[in-house]
Amino acid sequence: MSFNDNVQLDTSSIGSGGGGGGGGRGGLVVGGGIGGLILAILAMLFGGNGGTLPTTQDQTSYGDNVQSVDDSAIKQQCKTGADANKYVECRIVGTVNSAEAYWAQELPRYGKKFREPKTVIYSGATQSACGTASNQVGPFYCPVDESIYIDGSFFDILTQRFGSDDGALAQEYVVAHEYGHHIQNVLGLLGRAQQDPQGAQSGAVRVELMADCFGGMWAQAAATTQDANGNTYLKPLTQDDVRSALSAAAAVGDDNIQERAQGRVTPESWTHGSADARQNWFIAGMKSGNDINKCNTFSVDDPETQIAS
């Protein structure tokens, strides 16, 4: 989706560097989002613990390779929708702004007070309260510091290695998905991923598919979200936009990544859901009419083949 050129971007919730400090693990990455899936594949191929993000205690320190995107550079560069259409980091900022505007309006309808997450845009690696974030892991949400961590170079990985197209909504879908994990955290649902962490019908898969559905809810309403001056953030959704989002959802399906990585599909080890299910739940969110209950993946017996009614 393209941003309206005159919309004003707000960088007040955008940071650089880690939210957790130090090298120790302050908590688990619950609902680790798309990044968690990539990490699991890396662990499968190269060994290691695929259940949590690596920390400096169990991997080589990044040392001088640890980089941050300068806060001041983002504030100077990311001012308008025109910047969001031109620069990846600014598109992240704009998507966060729009998602914030949407969920700040929606959550009170369900008796929940909205609280804003922090979004950390980094390059290379940085620290979070859940351990070390790196561009090998990809985007994730850390519930301990209520922050989204994202390296813009992940979008190149998504297209070059996993087959997504490079449309704007493919990238915005990733951000909206991670924002969806924050909404799950506010709703008290995120911990269910840990209680049942693996398998096609597991709590982990249901949490991820719900975040996809939340992303679809935002996408359908994004063109109505407004900045502080009443300007709408994004232009109306097009069929090409939807195709881009669905290509990204399919690219990070467990079956797609397993087939690419190991040449076979093992549903019993899934943590995020199949390509078809991820697409279906994103569409379900788009068709939900802003009814969050339509995204209740725990209300169906099989989230791979069923959609909440």
Question: What is each residue range found by the language model?
Answer:
Residues 255-309:
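Pan-zinc metallopeptidase signature
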Residues 90, 94-96, 106-108, 210-255:
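Short helix/loop segments within enzyme catalytic domains
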Residues 124-151:
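Catalytic zinc-binding patch centered on the HExxH motif and its immediate surroundings
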Residues 1-73:
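Long amphipathic alpha-helical segments used for membrane anchoring, targeting, substrate engagement
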Residues 41, 103, 150, 173-186, ...:
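Active-site recognition of the HExxH zinc-binding catalytic motif
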Residues 156-173, 199-205:
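Short pre-active-site segment immediately N-terminal to the catalytic Zn-binding motif
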Residues 179-195, 217-218, 222-224:
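Catalytic Zn2+-binding segment of zinc metalloproteases
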Residues 2-16, 199-230:
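Post-HExxH zinc-binding segment in Zn-dependent metallohydrolases
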